[in-house]
Amino acid sequence: MTTSDRGLATLRCALGALILLWAGVLIGVSFLAAPAKFNAPSLSLPVAMDVGRQEFGVLNLVEIGLAILTLALAAYVRPGRLIWLALGIAALVVAVQALWLLPLLDARALSIIEGETPPAAPWHALYIMLEVLKLLALLVAGWLALWRLRAG
């Protein structure tokens, strides 16, 4: 194995690690921290909504950064079609959330914080479904990236 081959293998390993880091951040915030705050009996709904707005705003910025880094590294190491497909799905979900869904959820949360009762809307359920889709895409991409290393 040449030095160049070792360097590419290292970058491919870094790609798998970066993808799984992104998945871990997503699990930690969306699937652990966010639901836990709504189980805190001393936290009122408006306060929990305000914390959630901040929490998911920061998560979205972190995910945009992770998506850019991951896609840039993938462009360099050329990981294969299935990994590209999975990363594309994850990045598309982040874009849809940032540009469309989070602003809708933010406006809804603000109305609840102000004491209003907004009409029922499917946005939160859609957000959860997209989080699950994104997580599955990242886990598939990470597994494939690391499997490809093992296969040579």
Placement of each model-derived feature along the sequence:
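Interfacial loop at the N-terminal end of multi-pass membrane proteins
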Residues: T2-I68, P103, A109-T117, A121
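Short, charged juxtamembrane terminal tails flanking transmembrane helices
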Residues: T2-T3, W147-G152
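Interfacial segments of alpha-helical transmembrane regions
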Residues: D5-A23, L73-L92
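Membrane-embedded alpha-helical segments of multi-pass transporters/permeases
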Residues: F31, A95-L99, L136-W143
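C-terminal transmembrane bundle of multi-pass solute transporters/carriers
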Residues: N39-P41, D50, L59, A74, ...
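Hydrophobic alpha-helical transmembrane segments
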Residues: V58-A67, H124-L139
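Structural signal for the C-terminal ends of transmembrane alpha-helices
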Residues: A72-R78, W143-L149
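Mid-bilayer segments of alpha-helical transmembrane spans in multi-pass integral membrane proteins
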Residues: A91-P103, E131-K134
